[in-house]
Structures are given as structure tokens and as C-alpha cells.
Design a protein with these regions (language model features):
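NAD(P)-dependent aldehyde/semialdehyde dehydrogenase
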Residues: 1-105, 112-123, 129-156
Length: 158
């Protein structure tokens, strides 16, 4: 999701150029992944109004949504497929955040803005809110559970 701003297009260009530059050197694009991405785009286009966003190649595939459907998670695709939607406020994404969502990756927000967003909208699905690039970083608190407490066996002797 992008937050509406007068510099939005420049921010998108800068962000996606950096993502592409990083990914093209770290990942080998496989034919099956390219097919999965184009299939995901056509499937999404069959159900909603989307625009294909030009990229240098298929390392990252972007679709720009005209509106945000409540079932957007049904159109997820792995390996670098991104659905983008521009909002005026974070509150616009609240209706899609269900218990299926565990982690929210962010960039450019202050911690207190995100805490207020979660509290104001009473979001129940999010267990972790972390900067982009840290969404898969392992921690001892995972999906809202303290793993030490969860996996520690404490025998009792009476």
C-alpha cells in the first residue's frame, strides 16, 4: 500500500528500482515462477480492475488496483508478485486485515502511528509489525506467542 503524497510517483520509482536492483543479483528467475506470476495477474484481472505496472523484467511483477477488494488475500502469489493500492489513510486498509494476516511490513511510519492505527481499528490479526526487510526475521516472540514459555516443559514433583 502506498500513502497518497505529492511525491508518490517518484517514491514508487525509487523504491521499485532499489527492489529490482537488489533482487536481480540475489535471485535466479525460474521459468515456472514467471508463469506463476503472469497467471496470477490474469486471474486477478479476471476478477477486478487492475493495471500492469511496467518493470525491467519479471523479477518483480506489479499490479495496480483500482479499488481494494475485501478478499485481496485470495490473489496472493509468491516469488515477487505485488498488488499495489494507494490510500489516503492507513485506516482504508483496516477492512481487509483479518486473522489471516500475521505480519505487517512497513516503511516510512513512526511506531506511534502504527500503534494508533491498530488500536483505532481494533485489528485482531496482526501479531508483528516490522520494517520491510525484517518480515521473516526470527524472534523468540512469534505470531504473538512467547516461544520459550510455549515450548518449555516444566515437570512437577508433588
Amino acid at each position: 500500500f502506498w500513502l497518497q503524497d505529492e511525491h508518490l510517483e517518484a517514491a514508487k520509482d525509487r523504491f521499485w528500482n532499489a527492489v529490482h536492483e537488489h533482487a536481480e543479483h540475489k535471485y535466479r528467475l525460474q521459468a515456472v515462477v514467471s508463469v506463476d506470476k503472469i497467471t496470477a495477474f490474469y486471474r486477478q484481472a479476471a476478477y477486478m480492475d487492475v493495471k500492469y505496472e511496467k518493470m525491467p523484467d519479471n523479477v518483480a511483477v506489479r499490479s495496480e488496483l483500482v479499488e481494494l477488494p475485501k478478499n485481496i488475500e485470495d490473489f496472493r502469489c509468491t516469488c515477487g508478485y505485488f498488488s499495489e493500492y494507494t490510500v489516503r489513510s492507513l485506516d482504508e486498509i483496516a477492512p481487509i486485515v483479518t486473522t489471516k494476516y500475521q505480519t505487517l511490513g512497513y516503511y516510512g511510519f513512526e511506531k506511534n502511528e502504527l500503534i494508533d492505527f491498530i488500536r483505532r481499528n481494533r485489528l485482531k490479526g496482526l501479531d508483528r509489525v516490522v520494517p520491510i526487510g525484517e518480515t521473516t526475521v526470527f524472534a523468540l516472540t512469534w505470531d504473538g506467542y512467547n516461544l520459550i514459555d510455549t515450548f518449555t516443559r516444566i515437570p512437577s514433583v508433588i
